Amino acid sequence: RSSDLWPDYLVFLIDNAPDLGTFTLYGHQYCEGEILPKSLYAKDPIFPPKESYIPDILSHGTKLHIGLVDIDTVKGGDLAGAVQQQISRGCRILVFDAITKRDTLHIIRTLQPLYPKVFWTGSLGLADGLAEYLYGPEQPLPPAAVRQVRCLGFCASAYEIAKKQLAY
């Protein structure tokens, strides 16, 4: 178990991708504005989601205590105090509500200096937030040259999204 190998580390989960309409609100995952079980992932041929509450989803795979820091705290509450309170209660995994890039950056900027021993996990929004925190704001790229290029792609996936990507 990872908790045995890294007993002094915490897990902070921020699962959002603001550019794609994916966010976490009161612990529930939304994709393209739809709650997870009704989102495009509901058509997943292998593992369609049955629930949306991230702490419950995570609890199926761990015995560690899981806490939630809700959007009210992220946007205007005592974020550091709320996290300390959850940790004092024995939570080793904390799920953070996050809707916007600003939410993600606020969480990282507030907590990274206080908690250096954290496994940050999440999705594209977290990756973007960590990159900006560590390296500064994204720098615009010069426009790419337009080229006439043909492409052949293969995909061995039953996922509807993969079919749409290939059709594009």
Question: Language-model segments: which ranges?
Answer:
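A generic local secondary-structure boundary/capping motif
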Residues: L25, P45-I46, A82-Q86, I107-L111, ...
